[in-house]
A protein has these predicted regions:
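Active-site beta->alpha loop and helix N-cap motifs at the rims of alpha/beta catalytic domains
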Residues: 2-5, 27-48
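Glycine-rich phosphate/ribose-binding loops and adjacent secondary-structure elements
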Residues: 39-184
Length: 184
């Protein structure tokens, strides 16, 4: 779940589901693609441990397994992620740019990105796991200044999602969810 719309799934409008995308996802082209807000086979923390192990097996134990948390219940979620054995945690704050969420959700749900890293740091300190847990912060990291702030507050790395899609042609008109973006 993205930090800009925690707890919600995603939807890609039918006209954006090209044949190439359909082949990759194993779905028919030209129909709405809806992604659930959660994995249907993960009902609790115990199921999450099993999923981590399944992913490790699928990659031959050669790749790290991470979890992306939409910043909401940061303290609790960080502790669960550490207990369940993820190699690193991606923490996504509410300030990420998404056109796939409603204005109400984007404006009023979630926790600001930099505040999220502070809560994560405190949660890791409470359980004595800060030294062996890597956190990648994302969601509203727009430039080098934001990245430096995040690193100074405790993030081990930052990720730039919006910058990458803008470099790819997105004009940030925030109309993804209604299919009216002029760039497609």
């Amino acid at each position: 779940s993205q930090g800009a719309k925690p707890g919600l799934g995603g939807q890609l409008m039918a006209k954006k589901v090209t044949q190439e995308l359909a082949d990759i996802r194993g779905i028919p082209a030209g129909i709405d693609l809806r992604s659930p807000s959660r994995h249907p086979d993960i009902l609790g923390a115990d199921d999450l441990v099993i999923k981590v192990e399944e992913l490790r097996e699928a990659t031959g134990y050669k790749l790290p397994v991470s979890v992306k948390l939409g910043a909401g219940r940061v303290r609790d979620d960080i502790k669960i992620a550490v207990k369940d054995g993820f190699d690193f945690i991606e923490l996504d704050g509410m300030q990420g740019s998404t056109g796939a969420g409603s204005a109400e959700v984007i404006d009023y749900v979630g926790i600001p990105t930099l505040a999220a890293i502070i809560e994560a740091e405190e949660a890791l300190a409470e359980i004595g796991r800060r030294q062996d847990t890597q956190i990648v912060l994302m969601g509203g990291i727009r430039d080098g200044i934001d990245a430096v702030k995040a690193l100074c507050l405790g993030a081990d790395a930052v990720a730039f999602g919006t910058s990458a899609i803008i470099a790819g042609g997105c004009i940030a008109c925030m109309q993804c969810h209604v299919g009216q973006c002029v760039t497609g």
